């Protein structure tokens, strides 16, 4: 079942920047481009302008996601992924990038695709304070509690001594930003 696309108002801050586009049918994110050329040394971060401002309808938000190719090929990540663009924000969308490669600089040229913009319907909720929350299967299990990786308890979701860092349990928690020297 197909429906008409949501109309989002957009204004170019840079008159030459291409508007965000979906590269292929079915893509969730429209590509955002930088309007600045910039080189990032290993470990350096920068705020890159996209040259566009948007006006989202009430009940919607846009989320700035990383481009997987930049992460896989260059070690580029977004510091606050996903970045949230609220419906009431009218300023230029900017993208906070970081070069996680320990050895190589990465260069962005004007109009390079740097991120993806995903527009989604969002709910405003009313928070109701209670003394106790209802029980669930997960309960208070947090980071790594479901396993699935050797560093957090085994490749098959191991529990018990392996999950506690035993003979096959790895170090239990994987580092979010690891030292990539020697890779």
Give short role names for the model-derived ranges.
Residues 1-183:
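DUTPase catalytic domain/fold
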